[in-house]
Amino acid sequence: MKEMNICGINKNWVLPEAQENNVKKFLPRPLSRVNGWSPPLHSFQAISWITYLAMSIVTFGIFIPFLPYSWKYAANIVMGGVFIFHLIVHLIAITIDPADTNVRLKKDYTQPVPAFDRSKHTHVIQNQYCHLCEVTASKKAKHCSACNKCVSGFDHHCKWLNNCVGRRNYWFFFWSVASAAVGILGVMIILCYICIQYFVNPDELRTDPLYKEIISENTWLLFLSLWPVPVKTPIVLSIAVMALLLAIASFVMLGHLLIFHLYLITKNMSTFDYLMKTRFKKNLHPAEEKELPLQKKGDLPQEKSDNWAWPKSPPRVGSQKFPVSTLSPKSSVCFVASPPKICHSED
């Protein structure tokens, strides 16, 4: 029989907080991630690579060979250049370590990061010193909770790259998005031309010499340049429709993301600045919001004495004039799609 006290409470009952603290003591301390190739890899990486591979196969293996003979060379050169450029900048954006200079010079990525103790420190970074990385960080650096390190010129944590985007790889990220949008737009133009020509003048899609041996107009050749595969019209149309729908969905997301970053560039803001400024405005009264001056990049009320991308402790009464973030301990600024939002790093 359970032993109870006078209030009817089990004496062996443990407070949830104490239970949680006991569990945390036995959990291994996390390591910092070097770049987008560091485990754990993210499922969004697989989606992006599968999409890139699928678009490459259908574009160069199926649809460009349908174009008029004189257009094929131009299409292969232009689309090939865009796809190769995207691959290069995408790989660079993933591979670069965006950590702050002092972190890269001092940090041993094989060693676990110390746990943050709020009883000793109010914030992760104070007076430009990071208590987790144990280095003096640059002014615009933030400590990313997903990568568990200070990132120079922190913009956001990108799940598609599985890497933080900061000062060292921001422009590679930007050109990766821009080249992907241009490439997808090119695929959409080619697909629209093929669909229109199929109903208007299908002979324009059968200019390759190999079609002279094909008697049936309901038979089409895929992968003409490598290994011609004869298929019926419904198969070609099904592939074209699926590719077009995928291209449209990708272009909407990429276009939105590209426009958003063009806006940030014109305003000289980072994604992190934008999110914090938006959150700050939501917590203001209408009268106070009208009086809020236009702020420059990195000059936000929340960052007046602290640079962070880590959850802050609740403000003490009378010591904090501005609202602070209520991010959970495993949250970071991430891109799932555009616009950006606060999301859990383990999602």
Curated annotation (Swiss-Prot):
Protein name: Palmitoyltransferase ZDHHC11
GO biological process: antiviral innate immune response; peptidyl-L-cysteine S-palmitoylation; positive regulation of defense response to virus by host
Active site: 158 (s-palmitoyl cysteine intermediate)
Assembly information from the UniProt record: Interacts with IRF3 and STING1; in presence of DNA viruses recruits IRF3 to STING1 promoting IRF3 phosphorylation and activation.
Annotated ranges, domain DHHC: 128-178
Subcellular location: Endosome membrane
Catalytic activity: L-cysteinyl-[protein] + hexadecanoyl-CoA = S-hexadecanoyl-L-cysteinyl-[protein] + CoA
GO cellular component entries: endosome membrane
EC annotation from Swiss-Prot or TrEMBL: 2.3.1.225
Residues on Lumenal side: 68-75, 192-234
Signal sequence, renumbered to the chain: none
Membrane topology: Multi-pass membrane protein
Key words of the record: Acyltransferase, Endosome, Lipoprotein, Membrane, Palmitate, Transferase, Transmembrane, Transmembrane helix
Enzyme class: transferase
Membrane-side (Cytoplasmic) residue stretches: 1-46, 97-170, 256-347
Residues covered by region (Disordered): 291-332
Domains: entry comment: The DHHC domain is required for palmitoyltransferase activity.
Residue spans of biased composition, Basic and acidic residues class: 291-306
Outcome of mutating residue 158 to S: Loss of protein-cysteine S-palmitoyltransferase activity
Name of encoding gene: Zdhhc11
Family of the protein in this entry: Belongs to the DHHC palmitoyltransferase family.
